[in-house]
Design a protein with these regions (language model features):
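Conserved small/polar residues in nucleotide/adenosyl-binding loops
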Residues: 387-394
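Transmembrane catalytic cores of multi-pass membrane glycosyltransferases
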Residues: 8-12, 24-29, 159-264, 292
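Transmembrane-helix signature of polytopic, membrane-embedded enzymes
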Residues: 85-108
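Short hydrophobic alpha-helices at membrane interfaces in multi-pass membrane enzymes
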Residues: 134-152, 198-202, 268-275
Length: 394
């Protein structure tokens, strides 16, 4: 209800529903996205790589003014609540969150704060991350064979983010050759490295071939490797480096401190995806959503271990509640909590004064300038800024 009341927060939503409407009305997929001018103004051609995602958003907009929020969150939260009920009622342990990818998808659904094909792509990434882990860790499982199907959907719903699948698939190929490790809280058991590398390598090749099943074929790959370059990202806020004060990034780093303080063993195959996403997030803030996805399995495993240990302490203490942390673990937990409070205090004034957060209207002088320019294609705030800046220079 809160999401429905607030409405769509991302202005890119309107760009995508207009594109989806045009495709539905003309019954044809455009050779290029005529509603995006940034690449075109630089002499590049913007591929409508989110054509299917735009159609989905357009169709949902005919039903609900705020698509993807109520429906997805209700489904995933209900599934999460049901899983917890099963755990409490029948004692089904949740030590391995990869047993059910709904746990991983839950937070990604909560992170979809705007109706965009990219948000659907994040859900596809969560499913892909689950399938990659399942194929890597369970030699008998065949679920990973579904990944090429996910790649096909991904290439058509939000093909511009498909390289993230290839990057993580490559990471799992490289992790197959990791040695045995048991130091600094990181553990890894090397098992059948050649077989794992062959499986993950073959999967990467099939995924790349599956991604070609889109209206543009290999031109889609040319788009996200050549056309969608640094020049096109220069004026876009979500492609800027992330600040440490970002609440999502700070939460992930703080939770890592808590896990390390509790002396919980971390699998190297859990840590490396997190490290890669942290490095990418430091360069592009939009990767923080993927960072949260790869953090969720470790968070669930940590909480499950803590709950089991607390339960054992309570039984030994006659059923009375006892502190979960002691000594250094308790100290680092307090330090992390204090740092989180400090970060919130620092970040709160920015939220309070940020026009994008407060919904403040543009001043009258700026509105008059926009009317004088008579722009034809302005759908986001950074486009407005870039357009007026270019006009002022002229």
């Amino acid at each position: 209800l809160i999401f429905e009341y607030n409405g769509v927060g991302d202005s890119d939503y309107y760009w995508h529903i207009v594109l989806g409407r045009e495709i539905c009305q003309t019954h044809s997929i455009p050779t290029r996205d005529t509603f995006s001018w940034l690449s075109d103004s630089l002499g590049l051609q913007e591929t409508a790589h989110s054509w299917l995602g735009s159609i989905i958003l357009y169709k949902l907009s005919l039903i609900n003014s705020n698509p993807m929020y109520g429906q997805l969150i209700f489904v995933f939260v209900s599934a999460f609540a049901y899983a917890l009920f099963v755990d409490l009622a029948w004692g089904k342990e949740l030590n391995d969150p990869f047993e059910n990818c709904l746990f991983v998808c839950l937070v990604t659904a909560l992170m979809t704060w705007g109706g965009r094909p990219m948000n659907i792509g994040i859900l596809l990434f969560a499913i892909s991350f689950y399938l990659l882990n399942d194929g890597y860790r369970n030699s008998e499982s065949k679920k990973y064979r579904l990944l090429p199907i996910v790649a096909i959907f991904w290439a058509n719903i939000h093909g511009g983010s498909l390289p993230i699948l290839f990057a993580f698939n490559t990471l799992f190929v490289l992790m197959s050759f990791l040695p045995d490790v048991n130091t600094f809280g990181l553990v890894n058991e090397r098992e059948q490295p050649t077989a794992k590398a062959r499986k993950m390598g073959s999967l990467l090749a099939v995924n790349m071939l599956a991604g070609l099943l889109n209206p543009y074929g290999f031109k889609l790959y040319y788009y996200f490797f050549i056309t969608n370059n640094e020049a096109t990202k220069r004026y876009v806020s979500e492609w800027q480096p992330c600040a440490l004060a970002d609440p999502v990034v700070f939460f992930c780093i703080a939770f890592l401190f808590v896990i390390v303080a509790s002396r919980t063993k971390i699998r190297l195959t859990e840590f490396l995806p997190i490290l890669c996403c942290l490095l990418l997030t430091s360069r592009y803030v939009r990767i923080r959503s993927y960072l949260l996805v790869v953090m969720i399995p470790l968070i669930f495993r940590f909480l499950s271990v803590m709950m089991k240990e607390q339960e054992n302490r309570m039984w030994k203490n006659g059923g009375r509640f006892t502190m979960g942390f002691t000594g250094k673990s308790k100290f680092w937990t307090i330090v992390t909590s204090a740092a989180l409070v400090v970060a919130c205090c620092i970040y709160a004034p920015f939220i309070a004064t940020n026009p994008e957060k407060t919904g403040d209207k543009m001043d009258a002088e700026f509105v008059e300038l926009l009317h004088a320019l008579n722009p034809q294609r302005m759908y986001t705030s950074y486009n407005c800024l870039l357009y007026t800046s270019d006009a002022a220079d002229d």
